[in-house]
Amino acid sequence: MNEIITARGSLLIAGVTIDGATVDIAVDEKGTIAAIGKDAKKTIDADIVIDGSDRIAVPGLVNTHTHAAMSLLRGYADDMILQDWLSQKIWPLEAHLTGDDVYAGTRFACLEMIKSGTVAFNDMYFFMDRAAAAVDDMGMRATLAYGFIDLGMEEKREAEIKATETLVAHVRSLDNPRIRVAVGPHSVYTVSPEGLRWCAEYAAEQEIGIHVHLSETEKEVVDCVARFGKRPAYLLDDCGCLTPRTVAAHCCWLDEAECRLLAERGVTASHNPASNMKLAVNRAMPYHWLKAAGANVSLGTDGCSSNNNLDLMEEMKFAALLQKFAWNSPTLLPAGEAIEMATAAGARALGTGPGTLTVGAPADIVLLDARAVCNTPLFHADSNAVYACNGGAVMTVLCQGRVLMHEREVPGEEEIVREAAAAARSLVDRAQDSS
Amino acid sequence: MNEIITARGSLLIAGVTIDGATVDIAVDEKGTIAAIGKDAKKTIDADIVIDGSDRIAVPGLVNTHTHAAMSLLRGYADDMILQDWLSQKIWPLEAHLTGDDVYAGTRFACLEMIKSGTVAFNDMYFFMDRAAAAVDDMGMRATLAYGFIDLGMEEKREAEIKATETLVAHVRSLDNPRIRVAVGPHSVYTVSPEGLRWCAEYAAEQEIGIHVHLSETEKEVVDCVARFGKRPAYLLDDCGCLTPRTVAAHCCWLDEAECRLLAERGVTASHNPASNMKLAVNRAMPYHWLKAAGANVSLGTDGCSSNNNLDLMEEMKFAALLQKFAWNSPTLLPAGEAIEMATAAGARALGTGPGTLTVGAPADIVLLDARAVCNTPLFHADSNAVYACNGGAVMTVLCQGRVLMHEREVPGEEEIVREAAAAARSLVDRAQDSS
């Protein structure tokens, strides 16, 4: 294995390109960026030196909406009507999921995210204690939420409350600054107002985040209005779920007033363009309204079964192109804003720092190959990163100063892939045996 | 260099996966698939053996609409209104293009296409004799058209006719079965009916293809109706340009009758989803109408300045997702049809064989990494290829039985990238000096 991956200590990235200039980046033992510039090397006595020539440094990417362990369901079923896909394919398989599956699937998802430049993610699923173990092993950051679904049933709600409290206690007990916990009320169509209210109060009391699906489909909006007399964002707001600690995924069918409401409450809207296109939700997130209102808009891949990958570099292209196409404006969401979405906006959402390459920020750093085909010619690095490259251009990934990948090598990759394949096969076998 | 790349002769791909079965593929000295199956190895005494374990074989991809040398303009200007982008950025730069630039840019484009699994492409640009030299050097197949633009001026038309005739004579003189020539009337808004008629007659006389842009924007349709009293497809038909040898790019704004007309004439419609989204053309190709009419629908990346890459694996995902989103149907353009678009439909369009892995077909073969993250788990290879993978999963590429890439190694890659970067820099410098 490359010794740069196994070494620990302070670190210097020498002669790397940032915004067209060649600089050094010094990272101290705590994993904080200590200096950036031509003289940065003088500020530390680096234990590790990474050659930054032919490399472009960008902040580590942040995936603000996924269901990581669903990597095991990649390609299991596609090209179906949403309801058939869920009821005939996804749910019957998920009924057989074990904690071991979630560990294998989350570890595999972390591998995929690291290989495409992601350092932190916002996750919602089940067996999240095992997801935490996987994140810990892989050295990434994550905010983990148990998917809270009460379907309006009090008994189920009590069980979900317990599951949520158990996860929060577990993650707190880990005392790992890279791993955070959030409350995960699934959506207004799967959680009762009572459940939503409990989630909001508990999140406030615990000072933790809220991770929720919002206005993914038109049906969600229509049903919500029919049932509660108000649109989903207003229902969430009534229940106290719209806070600066809230990440609302999808947000396709928000109207303009709801966009203003999200901005006023400090909510982050997570754009998930590939999933929205694949599932044909028939409307792209109104980014222009959210932007005009000053909302924080971040980027997410959604789970592997509705994307079908976790490559946030690719997702930036889908975001920038979908916004242009859906809202009929070739100038909407230019490359620089797409990168901001995938970095700083995500970091703000998850509270993992500024999400920029600045002194004092956590050293969450991605090095892209400046000699890659997709980076040639190199007129505008932002344009190439968004429109031409995918995760394959990512060469090195640092999270809090620790090297998770170097020259595309991630420790244990073969074993992680093999175990994910075995877990997926076993899951399908068990589901078929029982049917 | 890997000896499998330099070796010449008959070839065996041993133990490779096709449609879930493990088989051998035997390729004879002429580059034709001689046998496929468990006993294929017995049919030839192979000079070269490629280990197919952990590899999935698919037909080589065919890119049916691009402007290859525009790889030099990748990322030069983005996120602009189409007319500003062309008049302020692209055209001023193109005015300084030389034959050497086109050679460097096309060779670089070939490298990018090979690295993402493309074996053949349909090109339209200038200095196409130099493009032919690049294609020859790189071992790919291409159909080359000079972009014919008369703007209604007779003098210009005469010059375009001469340029077209010169290119046709040049390509014929090469006598290279991998390199074909076509007539390239740019579009109904840049070529007069007289010019279109000449193109159609000359193509018929020479028995060569026609490569044209069709109904990319609403403005094109509106202007055509105002000027000629008919929609673009009907104007092209009146001029004789709709033939089984015709590839019409974009086709976003076709109405249902035009889709039937294209099908009746045997025209191939080339879908270019990423370009259409990036330039915000406001309507996706009506694939459902073309499919219902029985038209041949293929896939293309368009040029690098409006995509911004030539990765047809990525383009399959854009096609499958854009169709679902734009026409509000999660079942439209399933994975298998996206692969058909990128392989067999393209091969039919360019006359390069069936575009399938079948005995007697040219050995245009791509080997994908079955152990890649994007191919794990491997429930459905088609789904993974379209929705999860990009060109990075392509390990080996054969064109007419010749190995163009093996284990991601392409001969001369570093030099080709370096020369493209230098050519792009020099082009911009010359343009700036003259402004």
List PLM regions with ranges.
Chain A
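Active-site microenvironment of metallo-dependent hydrolases
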Residues: 1-23, 27-34, 343-435
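Divalent metal-coordination and catalytic microenvironments
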Residues: 16, 31, 54, 65, ...
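Metal-coordinating catalytic core of metallo-dependent amide/deamination hydrolases
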Residues: 130-252, 257-259
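Active-site gating loops and adjacent loop-to-helix segments of metal-dependent hydrolytic enzymes
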Residues: 72-104, 111, 138-153, 158, ...
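Histidine/acidic-residue-rich catalytic or RNA/ligand-binding cores of hydrolases
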Residues: 218-230, 258-263, 280-290, 307-324, ...
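His/Asp/Glu-enriched, well-ordered alpha-helical/loop segment
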Residues: 238-245, 287-372, 386-390, 398
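Alpha-helical scaffold segments that flank or form the walls of functional sites
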Residues: 74-140, 163-174, 422-432
